[in-house]
Amino acid sequence: MSARPDPASASPGPEAVPGPVWLAPPQLPHWPIVWLVLESDPEGGPMDCALHSCGLAVDDGGSEIVPEAITADFEEPGGRRVWERFVARASEILDRYPEARWVHYSSDERASVQACAAAYGTPAGFFERLEEALFELLSRGVRRAVRLPLDTRTIRQVAALAGFRWRDPPPGPAGSMGRYRRAMASADPIDRAHVLREIADANAEDLMAMRAVWRWMIEQGPREYCG
């Protein structure tokens, strides 16, 4: 008869990775939704609105979204022209979908809106309408509904947990700004166009990642309060 192995001497198996711990049903606005990404200089001060790109998409909850890109040109430093184009397009969407919430991931977008509105101005009533419509997915959605075993400060890990497949490597805000600065230093229009296309693609990916997290929360979250 063979001896039983000593449990104390057995080699430990792989530790189980903790999963999501749901705290409450996700409290998310109804469709339609406008997904929003604003990219600016991550090292800028509160009034340094070095906005170089915007990504947005109207989502009715059914069909696939069509990301829109508003990117900087190279004629003027700072973000005035990007901001003016964004305000024009956002005004059209606010008029057409007055009840839609504008979903962004972290507090960065609200800070950019406030800084650019202060620096460059807005049409009467625009700032109040947009600020009222903003909905931060991280603080008002993710952190109120679920505890995750990862860093939630950026969307990358959260979206991956939700099943979204990212490109590799991710550009990130610092990478996008670095590419834009290199393009500003270049006189080659082909290089500049390529950089702006890369930035627009990265913003579109962020929009789709937010959508994936949103749908994951709706599908996987509890219907009743937990605990």
Regions picked out by a protein language model, each given a short descriptive name:
Residues 37, 137, 206:
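Acidic active-site catalytic centers that drive phospho-/nucleotidyl reactions
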Residues 26-33, 38-85:
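Metal-dependent catalytic core segments for phosphate chemistry
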Residues 66-177:
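Conserved DEDDh/DEDDy metal-dependent 3′-5′ exonuclease domain
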Residues 158-227:
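Acidic, Mg2+-coordinating catalytic module of metal-dependent nucleases/exonucleases
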Residues 36, 57-59, 103-106, 202, ...:
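Generic beta-strand/beta-sheet core signal
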Residues 1-32, 36:
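N-terminal accessory regions of nucleic-acid-interacting proteins
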Residues 20-25, 39-45, 88-92, 99:
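Generic recognition of flexible, low-complexity loop/linker segments
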Residues 28-31, 48-52, 95-99, 160, ...:
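Short, well-ordered loop/turn elements at secondary-structure boundaries
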